[in-house]
């Protein structure tokens, strides 16, 4: 940019002239020097009371675009004088003023904010898409919560022109709503999906990423057709994604439990691998954690690049980054390289005091599943955590209980209170899914036909794993037969490899078998393809294909029946 000297600033008390000078500098991309700026703010402050709405807006907007910070005294005078004329502002002045304040990081006073929402609400019907988008976006940057009445009017008026929104307006509006924690009305969301879908092909990487991330934060499930269009259109732009866009998009899909298509996944791994060297610690952690939550194993080449590149940033990881990364590797059944593990333990030890119960227990559980040797510093924290925070957190306590044998092998003997199992059983989630319920009806009938004297127990709490089994038969084997119905989350790569259950499912099976239980796992897709959902209630007949399948699965275990 060019520079302007003080001699080019005339000594004037003409408000219009001063505004025009600063606005002209902005249009010409000329940055005034510090001396010129100081003289400008002094002269401008004396004339603020004479500005009209557009001049107020243009002055602050030009300062923001030129990245010139007004002095505190000028800011105070600006808010005081502009507040008296807010009722005369038009839609562009409202939008640009708040947007400029956000860009400059200047917080308007409470009274000004209240007047802004009250006066701008009356003009919302005149707002264009950019005004709507920029105003809400500015509110998020300033962490200002619009009034409830303004929000209602915003949704009502913006809905009428959603068809005119461009990709950035769609993305920024939803992203801002998510940042503010404002849930759009159902009708608005319906129109949003309808109108934004045809324009997805025009979205840039940031618009794709921010839109999906916003839906995840708001817990809004996009329609199936919109999702399909999103994957199709975003796949072609993946090579333009930056690290945060890669990370946020996959993380949002995981939070929404939306499985990206296979081709999109392949393109994602290929393109993101090139960008791994530019990932920050949050990008590394969130990407691997999202892959684990979706049950998607990254390709070997990507994994190798991940370990190499992430190792250099481990010193910047926070407790959640450490915990989520190791937890994801365990779930994905990926064994980190020896050197990476050494650096991981060395760097994580420095932050152990900042681990919350969940981060601590997740890290411990992952280490157990991966059969990693714990460093001495981590070992010394185990008993302390059990005595303090973890005793109050049943999820973490359950993890500690299930890793007791692993810890004992490393020289750590945990002593649990007498009421530990009772506490864990009381807090166990015993909700039964539709699939489990229908499978239970079928198992009971098939078992009755095969061995009438053997009974099936539903929701049996197993002390050895401090968890509830879906079904249990006492008479099979040393301790009995545990039958688990495994949904999609138990499998990697969308369940396409039957032997490829996730790390935690495999660990639970080994744990039960070590303790003397027989274990039968029934995959969801094999039940579904054998018509399990045709069973309407407990009196309905078992579909022949399902009956044959269950008999085949039960037979080896029933030979052990006593």
What are these regions (language model features)?
Residues 1-562:
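Eukaryotic RNA-binding helical-repeat scaffolds
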């Amino acid at each position: 940019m060019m520079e302007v000297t003080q001699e080019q600033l005339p000594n004037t008390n003409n408000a219009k002239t001063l505004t025009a000078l600063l606005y002209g500098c902005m249009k010409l991309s000329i940055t005034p020097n510090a001396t010129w700026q100081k003289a400008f703010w002094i002269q401008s402050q004396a004339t603020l009371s004479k500005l009209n709405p557009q001049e107020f807006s243009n002055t602050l907007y030009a300062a923001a675009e030129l990245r010139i910070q007004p002095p505190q005294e000028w800011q105070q005078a600006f808010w005081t004088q502009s507040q008296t004329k807010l009722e005369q502002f038009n839609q562009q002045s409202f939008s640009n003023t708040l947007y400029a304040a956000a860009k400059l990081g200047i917080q308007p006073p409470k009274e000004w904010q209240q007047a802004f929402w009250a006066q701008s609400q009356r003009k919302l019907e005149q707002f264009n898409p950019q005004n709507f988008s920029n105003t809400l976006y500015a509110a998020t940057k300033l962490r200002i919560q619009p009034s409830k009445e303004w929000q209602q009017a915003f949704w009502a008026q913006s809905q009428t022109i959603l068809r005119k929104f461009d990709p950035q307006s769609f993305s920024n509006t939803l992203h801002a709503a998510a940042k503010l924690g404002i849930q759009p009305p159902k009708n608005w969301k319906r129109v949003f999906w309808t109108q934004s879908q045809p324009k997805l092909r025009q979205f840039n990487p940031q618009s794709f990423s921010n839109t999906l991330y916003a839906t995840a934060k708001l817990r809004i499930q996009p329609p199936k057709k919109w999702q399909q269009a999103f994957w199709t259109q975003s796949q072609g732009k993946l090579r333009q994604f930056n690290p945060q866009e890669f990370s946020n998009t996959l993380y949002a899909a995981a939070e929404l439990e939306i499985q990206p298509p296979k081709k999109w996944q392949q393109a994602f791994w290929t393109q993101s691998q090139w960008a791994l060297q530019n990932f920050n610690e949050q990008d590394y952690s969130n990407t691997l954690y999202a892959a684990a939550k979706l049950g998607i194993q990254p390709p070997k080449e990507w994994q190798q690049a991940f370990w190499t590149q992430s190792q250099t940033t481990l010193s910047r990881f926070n407790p959640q980054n450490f915990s989520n990364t190791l937890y994801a590797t365990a779930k994905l059944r990926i064994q980190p390289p020896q050197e990476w593990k050494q650096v991981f333990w060395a760097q994580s030890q420095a932050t152990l005091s900042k681990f919350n119960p969940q981060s601590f227990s997740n890290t411990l559980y992952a280490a157990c599943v991966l059969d990693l040797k714990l460093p001495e510093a981590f070992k010394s924290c185990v008993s302390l955590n059990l005595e303090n925070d973890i005793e109050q957190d049943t999820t973490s306590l359950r993890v500690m209980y299930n890793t007791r044998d692993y810890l004992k092998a490393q020289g750590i003997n945990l002593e649990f209170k007498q009421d530990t199992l009772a506490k864990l059983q009381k807090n166990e989630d015993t909700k039964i899914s539709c699939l489990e319920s229908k499978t239970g009806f079928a198992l009971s009938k098939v078992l009755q036909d095969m061995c009438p004297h053997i009974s099936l127990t539903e929701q049996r709490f197993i002390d050895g794993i401090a968890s509830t089994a879906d079904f249990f038969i006492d008479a099979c084997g040393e301790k009995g037969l545990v039958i688990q119905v495994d949904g999609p989350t138990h499998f990697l790569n969308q369940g396409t490899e039957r032997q490829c259950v996730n790390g935690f499912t495999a660990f639970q099976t080994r744990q039960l078998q070590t303790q003397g239980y027989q274990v039968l796992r029934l995959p969801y897709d094999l039940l579904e393809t054998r018509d399990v959902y045709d069973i309407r209630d407990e009196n309905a007949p078992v579909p022949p294909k399902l009956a044959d399948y269950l008999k085949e699965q039960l037979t080896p275990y029933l030979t052990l029946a006593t």
